Amino acid sequence: MNWFKENNIFDNKLAKKPAASKLGASPTASRPAGSPAPRRVKPLNKSELAHAAIVKRIGRGSDRLNEISASFVPPEYGFRFDEVPACSHKLEYACERDLREHFLSDNEREAMKSLLRFATNYVLGYINSKDMLTFGRAAGLKLKNELEYVQESECTMCGYKFKDNTRVWMLYVIVRHPPRAASADEEFVPSPNTPDCFEFACCDCADNYPDQLNSHQVYPGINSLHAQRLVEAGFFYQYVFPLEYKTEYFTYNDVKIVHHEGPFKIIQRLLREYKRPNEHIVSITLRTTGGVVLKEINHNVRLMRYRNIYKEPTASDDVNCFTVSSSSELMKALDSGAFDSIQGTVFAEIYGFAIQEFVTGVITFPVRPVKGNYCAVCKKNKMYYSNPVLCCSKCGFTNRYIFNGKYDDLYFHPEAVQTHATHSTHGEFVRYYNLKLHAKICRERLEEYEAQNLQ
């Protein structure tokens, strides 16, 4: 299956987005309507209802008693915005602003958003499997109307129960690297598929951990550099399949802009017309015949639970928002009016890298295995007939470590995820990966690829 991954033939439709050779007139971008905070006279939405039910079930401590976090906006406050669309997160949003959040690939954005959602629940004291399905790429899968599997969360280093709600609302992921081999001739190749490689740590344990370079904050925010390191370490999976991070660098030279409408419109249109979903932009350089006039570099993008963690947000745009703290050459050019005198042709250079594999499934995380976490349907070996069980509504997501890397080389196809409804009293669902359907999809994609090459 490695040949399929290297050639990326399965994601042909996404990868073949045509790149424009010349920037023409852009469609008029209208300013979307604002997204004010929903008033509390309205009924609670699904996320708030689920949180309230889980808090009651696990007995979470009151926020009012957590004095150390009194100055922070509570993690659960943002749930009220889950059904309110945000405006500024979209590339086409008309307001002039820093566009570097859109330099990230869709893979990175999906991974960061999934991790922040998971971390938000984790800090609140639980892991909500239905929430992971709802906010992941699980379209078409049947869900129970009520809660599915819920697991209490804890610091895997000291055992602190986050539901106790007595420590600061922060969460870290620590990557434990195995010790070096005793002899240089006997190099040890670390495997990410072992339960002790990752720790979900409270702030106290993370602060005292000696290897700070491998300690990554994931709540109240996560930055893109840490997300990349976690991907490389094997932290992110799609169900029980690794999310790989193989990259290939590229440069688009001398993209010609004959009639420009200022630096913001130029970069916005370059991102819209040249950047593919699986591409990460490192820098965009604009120049004239006289030399470079602007170079926007993507240093580090951060995804925050709240734009200001000390002030309650009033709009959905300030919840789960991407921010960039480093200075922006684009914003400097807008403030100074540097492009006002440039009337001729502007040339653009785009430098970045493409990620070969796309995020097409629900992203899961290396939670420690729970002993006896199986039922009569998903069984101890987590197999539905000859197919691996991915998620059970009663027992949650199948722990990646159960299969001991057996399916690590399979290229994940979302079409092969299927649901079996049990006949139990509570109407449980088992989601499994149909290996026969997987093989059929592989054959069809390969035949399609070969046919295209013969033309």
Curated annotation (Swiss-Prot):
InterPro entries per the record?
A: Baculo_ME53
Where are the annotated C4-type zinc-finger regions?
Answer: 374-394
Q: Name one Pfam family in it.
A: Baculo_ME53
Keywords from UniProt, A to Z, are: DNA-binding, Early protein, Metal-binding, Zinc, Zinc-finger
Region Disordered: start and end of each range? 20-42
A GO molecular function for this record?
zinc ion binding
Q: What is this protein called?
A: Early 53 kDa protein
Species in which this protein is naturally found: Orgyia pseudotsugata multicapsid polyhedrosis virus
Q: Lineage of the native species?
A: Viruses, Viruses incertae sedis, Naldaviricetes, Lefavirales, Baculoviridae
The UniProt gene name for this protein comes to: ME53
